[in-house]
């Protein structure tokens, strides 16, 4: 039974791969089309928006500070839970 299952699966895969060989000849991404004037204008750098551009070093530093604060808050919460459990155990004993 397992032999029949394996042969039927392999024959199915072989037949489906033969069907898709022609489709693989065409690129999956399609053809490259040059950008039009409107797209080029939208992608061009705009001088009026330059002051709103985020600076990579500043953003990286801010992310790092946020990560550190998150770790500190989580550690503080864990310590509070630990302290309350120990306090309850001390009262119960």
UniProtKB/Swiss-Prot annotation:
| Keyword flag Transit peptide | yes
Q: In which pathway does it act?
A: Carbohydrate metabolism; tricarboxylic acid cycle
One Gene Ontology cellular component annotation?
respiratory chain complex II (succinate dehydrogenase)
Give the matching InterPro entries. Answer: SDH7
Name its cellular compartments.
Mitochondrion inner membrane
**UniProt feature coiled coil, ranges:** none
- Superkingdom per UniProt: Eukaryota
Establish whether keyword Secreted is in the entry: no
- List this protein's GO terms for biological process: tricarboxylic acid cycle
Keyword entries, A-Z: Membrane, Mitochondrion, Mitochondrion inner membrane, Transit peptide, Tricarboxylic acid cycle
Residue range of the transit peptide? 1-30
Membrane topology type: Peripheral membrane protein
Subunit comment: Component of complex II composed of eight subunits in plants: four classical SDH subunits SDH1, SDH2, SDH3 and SDH4 (a flavoprotein (FP), an iron-sulfur protein (IP), and a cytochrome b composed of a large and a small subunit.), as well as four subunits unknown in mitochondria from bacteria and heterotrophic eukaryotes.
Q: What is this protein called?
A: Succinate dehydrogenase subunit 7A, mitochondrial
């Amino acid at each position: 039974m397992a032999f029949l299952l394996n042969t039927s699966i392999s024959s199915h895969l072989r037949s489906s791969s033969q069907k898709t060989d022609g489709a693989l000849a065409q690129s999956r991404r399609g053809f490259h089309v040059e950008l039009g004037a409107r797209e080029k204008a939208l992608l061009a750098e705009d001088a009026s928006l330059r002051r709103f551009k985020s600076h990579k070093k500043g953003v990286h530093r801010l992310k790092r500070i946020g990560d550190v604060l998150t770790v500190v808050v989580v550690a503080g919460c864990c310590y509070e839970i630990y302290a309350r459990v120990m306090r309850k155990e001390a009262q119960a004993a």
